[in-house]
Amino acid sequence: MAGVACLGKTADADEWCDSGLGSLGPDAAAPGGPGLVAELSPELSWAPLVFGYVTEDGDTALHLAVIHQHEPFLDFLLGFSAGTEYLDLQNDLGQTALHLAAILGEASTVEKLYAAGAGVLVTERGGHTALHLACRVRAHTCAYVLLQPRPSHPRDASDTYLTQSQDHTPDTSHAPVATDPQPNPGNEEELRDEDWRLQLEAENYDGHTPLHVAVIHKDAEMVQLLRDAGADLNKPEPTCGRTPLHLAVEGQAAGVLALLLKAGADPTARMYGGRTPLGSALLRPNPVLARLLRAHGAPEPEDKDDKLSPCSNSSSDSDSDNRDEGDEYDDIVVHSRRSQNQPPPSPAAKPLPDDPNPA
């Protein structure tokens, strides 16, 4: 495990790289270099100790600020690291601070990290972006924040993340540790716009987009958010070619199905084996599914459409296919104030299937 054992010792360049910040480049620890500690003044001699700290689980100080929901410390860290790669350092589970904030459903933290320049396309060990994770835990406000265009300029110490004196007045005497030596305003706006939109098409290691995840979880509110943001309503998942309509039918989520149809999803779409959403609906006990599809012009299935595809062998054919892999991250809830006031959310208590309510 990576980690810095002693906070009381001066960290040299080797310790800095060993701490997990080596990804910032060999010059990151050199005074005047392009990394996180560029142009350090004597007042910032503490910076390598704080920003170089990593636990045995790979969590940085920024991860810990999110896990413990310590907003003053989070604001302090962001004041010096906004716009740098430090925001996207990953722990041993591949999670960035933004992933953790989404899992915990902390919308204000997501907003601060996003505004500071945290990457929204970074994936954790299951291939999930922060938006995927927000969809899995039904964190609607977090998803809403991530689906907004990023602010024009990452916040830095001269913006909202300022240290304050005892009388609560901003202290602007320090310079941000993080600097962008060669900003390119012409390209930044285009990249920001592309960045948040690309989230909608990002696939996890199961081939699911955030919309697929929201449909599998039968979350109509999240589906509406993604639809309003421009998600592709007809994109098939790669294993069997199921579109969001197919997934809604397989989950017997009539409300989600109605929402997708009203939004313009194609009722004639076919899985790789040839089955239409109506063909799948006729294998389910809920008659509302077929009625909704017929009302929106779904064609009656031919005999060949009724044959079982490689992905389905019963009326609950999605039960085994719509599950995410891997264990969840109970440590991030055990150490947060959330666990003191209410039961841990389901994604942190046990492995989280993509279909929490199998038919």
Swiss-Prot record:
The gene is Nfkbib. The modification Phosphoserine is found at S19, S23, S318. Keywords: ANK repeat, Cytoplasm, Nucleus, Phosphoprotein, Repeat. Gene3D superfamilies: Ankyrin repeat-containing domain. The lineage of its organism: Eukaryota, Metazoa, Chordata, Craniata, Vertebrata. The keyword Nucleus applies. GO terms for cellular component: cytoplasm; nucleus. This is NF-kappa-B inhibitor beta. GO terms for biological process: cellular response to lipopolysaccharide; inflammatory response; regulation of canonical NF-kappaB signal transduction.
